[in-house]
Regions:
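N-terminal Rossmann NAD(P)H-binding glycine-rich loop of SDR-like oxidoreductase domains
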Residues: 3-23
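NAD(P)-dependent short-chain dehydrogenase/reductase
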Residues: 128, 140-185, 189-190, 196
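NAD(P)H-binding glycine-rich loop region in Rossmannoid oxidoreductase-like domains
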Residues: 45-84
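Catalytic helix-loop patch of NAD(P)-dependent Rossmann-fold dehydrogenases
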Residues: 83, 87-91, 110-148, 152-157
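NAD(P)-cofactor binding segment of oxidoreductase domains
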Residues: 61, 76-104
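Conserved C-terminal active-site "lid" loop/helix of NAD(P)H-dependent oxidoreductases
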Residues: 216-222, 235-275
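Rossmann-fold cofactor-recognition segment
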Residues: 33-49
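Mid/C-terminal beta-alpha module of Rossmann-like enzyme folds, strongest
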Residues: 194-244
Length: 275
């Protein structure tokens, strides 16, 4: 089976690429913005003609879209955010369907405002930021394709990455541990494993990939600190901010059992130690 991963050097994309390359039944291709990457296919995703040529040439059975303009970058560049977060997934569907391919699109819990938590697939996205609105518009809900809503933590190749894991690992001294900011996402390794299972089980539509139990960012940081032996940081509990974008999965046709947080983080550490 031919797999094309768009954004193969990003936080989600590089882990998914590494994981799928270790599976013998997948022939893996990935795109990158790094012109010196000899293994990847160079792509500026705003170049629609090049994108079309790549898809027409490879004819992937499954295309995994890991490209996104995130958070502040989206708010500072609204035109680019809507082009990539909103329009690109719909453009991909049209290109991929020419050869009966399938799109797996990665969305985010940030489509929700975070005022109540436990959001289901049937809840109407109410996020108001440029990032939230652009991601809402890009979600593909179709019986042919799959949109995975989730929130991820994991290593990054870019030193200027903005994810929680990289941020925390690079800190020294004291950091705030938010006791009322709740999360129930997955590691990037767990996301890769879940996508593998979803491909094999032909899952489509909208899927919330989440843990059954939510965890505060304070406790999450403490878990990371313990498992990754991060001794040069003191986590100071802080209850000033309330935010709960936790997801709930109501699908019964396919159930992916997300492991406990400590198990996911231990497995991630073991994976990284082997690389």
């Amino acid at each position: 089976m031919k797999i094309l991963i768009l954004g193969g050097k990003g936080m989600a994309g590089h882990m998914i690429t590494s994981y799928f390359k270790q599976k013998q039944d997948y022939n893996v291709f990935y795109t990158s913005k790094d012109i010196n990457d000899k293994d990847g296919i160079y792509l500026d995703v705003t170049d629609s003609i090049k994108l079309e040529k790549i898809i027409d040439s490879i004819k992937p059975d499954v295309t995994i879209n890991c490209i996104g303009i995130l958070n502040e970058n989206a708010n500072n560049n609204p035109k680019l955010a809507f082009q990539i977060n909103s329009l690109l997934p719909h453009q991909l569907v049209k290109l991929i369907e020419r050869t009966n391919g399938k799109l797996i699109h990665i969305s985010t819990d940030c489509v929700f405002l975070g005022t109540k938590g436990n959001y289901t697939e049937n809840d109407i996205p109410d996020g108001t930021s440029i990032y939230a609105r652009s991601k809402q518009l890009g979600e593909i809900v179709s019986d042919k394709h799959l949109t995975i809503r989730t929130s991820i933590i994991g290593p990054e190749l870019k030193e200027n990455g903005i994810g929680l894991f990289l941020w925390f690992i690079s800190q020294q001294g004291t950091v705030k541990g938010y006791e009322k900011v709740y999360w129930n996402g997955v590691t990037t390794l767990e996301l890769a494993k879940a996508i593998d299972m979803m491909i094999r089980n032909k899952v489509s539509g909208l899927y919330h990939l989440c843990s059954e139990k939510k965890i505060s960012k304070n406790n999450l940081l403490r878990l990371i600190q313990s498992i990754f032996d991060k001794k040069d940081v003191e986590i100071v509990p802080n209850s000033e901010i309330f935010l709960d974008r936790s997801l709930t999965n109501t699908r019964t046709d396919f159930i992916y059992k997300v492991p406990p947080y400590d198990e996911m983080l231990i497995e991630l550490k073991e994976w990284l130690d082997m690389q």
